[in-house]
């Protein structure tokens, strides 16, 4: 028996959902806030009327499926119109898992888990029987988000969660673990940071750069993660040419400090791994000299995410074949590696020639180490000045 549904949205997602599940659903019509949209044509020969949002009626048209990446805003609008989440409407991700009867793999934690969820979607054998859904543990949840998370907790078959030293994070994880059905399979992932490439004398892992402005809910604003040496230069009024000279002469950090710092990183990583169901430290030790493994202190390159994903797939008895991504799965800038650090760690690539992926408000750019430093200096010096004048929080 086909499911009777209404689509909220007439764009790319709605067309893709229709194309994939047209044999399983009966579409009554579509809804849009845009009064100019009057007809939804998912494919040639198929036309459906588009209506403006209305208050809840008898519900004879079927379950409303929100076919939009901005489903949270639309869900709020539906709630204000009298609709009940998961009774009268749900977003397309949940609808897909319901229609296909795939087992939900709930990934709960930081952006590391989001990257793994994206990788799992690229594993063909896994995708035949499982539906990965990521949920962040660091955002305030509104009414719909709380209900959605509860729905996922009650219906997931596998729960992969991130563990940190945060008391709040521990409390959230324990609350979910105690609510899970005993038959749900669980995997714990320690949220690792790696400062080996980026040693600093003043560091608070995963804290906002004191000389940057953070956009609400996002880490990938320009220079979100700070460089304490450059920040100190800015605070002391040291000019850009003097900064260039110090870096070129490899006078930023001495070799003993770099190696001692790296030794501390290995101890911390190995300690964290003891509490994790994943093994990654050995891979980092074997490969960190050969190629860049981390974009900045808290965000990894795709190759690390592939290693984590392969372990999830092995745990579930699936093929570890993953289609490689064309772009970084974690949206944050690559921080430069000081030449003195590259020399002390005996890195096998030339950091002078490395093209760094820099996020800007105009989009992504590839820049040299000198261009990165110049932009960091100019941007963060201005923000440092504005904060000093109490013109920014």
Spell out what each predicted region is:
Residues 21-25, 78, 82, 120-124:
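Active-site catalytic pocket residues across diverse enzymes, especially alpha/beta-hydrolases
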Residues 28-34:
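Short internal beta-strands
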Residues 2-21, 107-109:
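Glycine-rich adenosine-cofactor-binding loop
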Residues 88-393:
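Extracellular glycan-modifying ectodomains
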Residues 35-98, 162-180:
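Phosphate-bearing ligand-interacting subdomains
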Residues 1-4, 60, 99-104:
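A short, charged/proline- and glycine-enriched loop
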Residues 28, 62-63, 156-160:
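Conserved acidic residues
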Residues 16-17, 73-77, 115-116:
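Phosphate- and divalent-cation-binding pockets in alpha/beta enzyme and binding domains
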């Amino acid at each position: 028996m086909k499911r009777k549904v209404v689509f909220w949205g007439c764009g790319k997602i709605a067309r893709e959902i229709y194309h994939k599940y047209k044999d399983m659903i009966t579409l009554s019509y579509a809804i849009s806030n845009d009064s100019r949209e009057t007809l939804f044509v998912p494919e040639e020969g198929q036309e459906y009327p588009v209506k403006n949002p209305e208050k809840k009626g008898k519900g004879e048209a079927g379950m409303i499926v929100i076919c939009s990446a901005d489903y949270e805003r639309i869900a709020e609008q539906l709630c204000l119109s009298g609709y009940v989440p998961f009774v009268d409407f749900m977003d397309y991700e949940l609808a897909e898992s319901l229609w296909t009867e795939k087992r939900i793999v709930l990934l709960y934690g930081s952006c590391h888990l989001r990257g793994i969820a994206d990788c799992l979607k690229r594993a063909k054998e896994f995708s035949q029987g499982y539906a990965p859904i990521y949920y962040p543990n660091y955002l305030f949840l509104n009414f719909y988000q709380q209900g959605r998370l509860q729905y996922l907790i009650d219906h997931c078959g596998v729960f992969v969660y991130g563990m940190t030293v945060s008391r709040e994070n521990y409390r959230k994880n324990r609350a979910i673990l105690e609510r899970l059905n005993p038959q749900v399979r669980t995997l714990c992932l320690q949220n690792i940071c790696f400062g080996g490439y980026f040693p600093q004398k003043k560091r608070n892992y995963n804290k906002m750069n004191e000389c940057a402005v953070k956009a609400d809910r996002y880490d990938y604003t320009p220079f979100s993660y700070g460089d304490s040496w450059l920040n100190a230069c800015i605070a002391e009024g040291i000019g850009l040419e003097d900064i260039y000279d110090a870096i070129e002469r490899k006078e930023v950090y001495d070799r003993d400090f770099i190696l001692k710092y790296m030794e501390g990183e290995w101890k911390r990583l190995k300690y964290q791994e003891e509490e994790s169901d994943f093994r990654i430290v050995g891979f980092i030790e074997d490969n960190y000299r050969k190629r860049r493994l981390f974009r900045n202190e808290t965000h990894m390159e795709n190759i690390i995410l592939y290693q984590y994903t392969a372990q999830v797939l092995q745990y579930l008895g699936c093929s570890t074949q993953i289609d490689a991504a064309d772009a970084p799965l974690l949206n944050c800038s690559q921080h430069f590696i000081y030449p003195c650090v590259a020399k002390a760690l005996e890195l096998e690539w030339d950091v002078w020639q490395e093209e760094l992926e820099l996020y800007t408000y105009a989009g992504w750019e590839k820049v040299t180490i000198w261009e990165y430093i110049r932009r960091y200096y100019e941007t963060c010096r201005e923000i440092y000045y504005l904060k000093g004048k109490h013109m920014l929080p």
